[in-house]
């Protein structure tokens, strides 16, 4: 079970050992002793100012170093304990699949046409279960949701950071699950994975619904705020010491921001496993996603016209995270035949705030793909489109 939880992060094990050793070392560190005065035998050799300065420095430097080491060790141990407590409280809810050296945590619900849901930055499978989307869609689809690499209980090797890399992993994972063709819904950062999957494996993706996405490069404050823990070595130290503490302080405000102008739903506040978001490995995943978001769309934007599947673009009209005009509306203009839906008065988290609209978009886009595939009358009768909600 340890490999499914904190043991999956090798850096965590090293920090745990180092923190324990550091705490023990600071307990044993002797206090700085006052410098002994030596008789001056040769006034030409002595330097009173230098000798006195060195003694003063030794009196404050040793306690300062000891205090700093103790503070770092205490922060590491506190964060490790918080990580273990979060995982005890919120254990894995699905199964594990090993794909291309990556351990993927996933759930599968329902029967019918395969439908893959891809979550955004900072979240995990529960983003779709808590919203009620999974249970409702499972009434007529085979719903598959993965924790993207580094989130929830999926591992994240170094280098597995771009939407295209995630799309290749999804393709291989779906092949292991026997999925030959699937409808796909991506939300926020997950829209980039969904688009990359449709571009790289058009034979696999039947239809595409893109929710609250980011598709064109613009300056975003969150990319600068979230990126530092992605820096090798320095970022590793940050995410085991100060980053979880800072994230814990700012998380309530960030959650309010993604739901604005609507309030945070009581169900989300009560059921979503927020402590899992503060673990070091997940902070690294979120930081890497933030750092690579703009470079990723700079590459992907040149290929949107190559999409060959039915596409629906859905967003909250008052999204406080992704600029609707510069992102969703522009993509709609550049994708002939796409459908665009802007939900008035809603922000970024549309599947929580308007699940009926998201489900309807998934159903109608999947039906368009059936019609474009030329289903015969017998097939249409056997698989009628779901009633509009």
Where would I find each of the regions flagged by the language model?
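Hydrophobic alpha-helical topogenic segments used for membrane insertion/localization
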Residues: 56-80
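Active-site loop/oxyanion-hole signature of alpha/beta-hydrolase fold enzymes
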Residues: 107-109, 145-186, 360
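Flexible "cap/lid" loop of the alpha/beta hydrolase fold
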Residues: 199, 208-240
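Short beta-strand/loop motif that positions the catalytic acidic residue
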Residues: 307, 313-315
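Acidic catalytic loop of the alpha/beta-hydrolase fold
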Residues: 318-322, 348
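Catalytic active-site module of serine/aspartate enzymes centered on a nucleophile-bearing elbow/loop
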Residues: 336-389
